Amino acid sequence: MKNKGQAKKGTMKRLIRMLFEFYPVLLPLVLVCIILNALISSIPAIFQQNIIAVVEQYWQTKDWAAAAPTVTRLVLILVVLYALSLAAGYAYSYGMAIITQGSLKKMREKMFNRMQDLPIKYFDTHNHGDIMSYYTNDIDTLRQLISQSIPQLLISCITVVTIFSIMLYYSMWLLLVVLCGVALMFVVTKKVGSSSAHFFLKQQIAVGKTEGFVEEIMNGQKVVKVFSHETETKKDFDRVNDELFEMSCQANRYANMLMPILMNMGNILYVVVALAGGMLLLSGAPNLSLSGMALSISITVPFLNMTRQFCGNIGQVSNQVNSVVMGLAGADRIFSLLDEEPETDDGYVTLVNAKEENGELVECSERTDIWAWKHPHSADGSVTYTRLTGDVRLKEVDFGYNPDKIVLHDVSLYAEPGQKVAFVGATGAGKTTITNLINRFYDIADGKIRYDGININKIKKADLRRSLGIILQDTVLFTGTVMENIRYGKLDATDEECIGAARLAGAHDFITRLPEGYQTVIDGNGSNL
């Protein structure tokens, strides 16, 4: 895993760009609703100031009838704005639900498609449980990031900017007091937030490691029982689980302490602003503001409410930052999977149906009993056809899973059509490795492998593998009917062909004794057989 200490820079930018690619029309509309909702939630202080100012104006004359139209108009405007905010909030929530679930669906599709393009080497060198964690834990953190953290962070940021502008309009002196307190809050946020970010990413890695361990033990449970290895396995799990516990505790310890600290700092700041406003009022100090209004009760009271709202949203920003950091850790892991290099294929020789005409092989569209290698020649544009016979020859082959450590050196052998060749040797001698090389699951370091006289590097991998039959050491069954599993190697095979294959394998009698015969649905890996 790359970047084990922190998420890559640019992960958020890449995620947002991808969301816009998924929903180029809906996402901007949702953003408009979010902005509208945030702006409306920020302006009640303006109406409060105006209403208090009207009350102050008519306090001396007690002419409340004259004040009523103005107050009524302000209240009605506020009601309309709140109704608009309610509609915008509903629209953005509904839209974000569509964007979130749709984006996760497309993200899973991207991940699965990329996984299908990865070479066998990737799955041999990565824990399967950790790979599964991409689809479960990391996708879930991404869901929280898209559906909750980013919208709430955007709303809080817009609210902070709007309230800051209103404060600047009413009183720069009181705003200066607020900014001093907020600066201290930012210092605390940066200190605590940076620590939690580091541990949130480590927590994601530890989750993948734990899931990988559990998956590994589940697959090897029989081996654990046979060797009475339960006690040691429990100790190994406790070690992995303790690591996850430690990383989770560290991450959440920093994250959970932040909000209470900021709330209490906000309460203290509220009292300080109230004292500062009272002292300025009593001293008759001139007000410095963009509005040009003198400092009065109609400004001080709304300013106190704005201070509480301002600090609350600063706290929300800080709180959401932790969620964003955790979500970005999951997104970074997902992008690391999407960025894995796919399996390359430079082959151009393909496998086609063929028939004989005038003693020569020609390509045909109908199914025949003859297969041929179609070999285009770029030099003169000609195409030649070579009958598929199964002649396999290895000449002076060198190979190593690690380029620095060669495990096969100067291997030469051949298998003629119809010839049976057995590889006998100790575990790790290279028996399976040779079959992997013929299938081009791995590429050789030196030498040549020829198939019907053609260098296998020139044959497209899909056609090469389609021409070969492999019986794996471990039985792999997929969820579906018995018939569908037999048909897996030839999707257009008829039921009669599948039954014939089962007879050849000696499985027909066993299959017919199943509850639904060939239509019996089996679970993955045949756990219900």
Residue ranges and their predicted role:
Residues F22, L26-L39, Q148-L201, L275-L295:
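Transmembrane helices of ABC transporter permease
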Residues K2-K8, I40-E56, Q60, L81-H128, ...:
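Juxtamembrane helix-loop junctions of ABC transporter transmembrane domains
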Residues V25-A91, L168-W173, L275, S283-A294:
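Transmembrane helix-loop-helix hairpins at lipid-water interfaces of multipass membrane proteins
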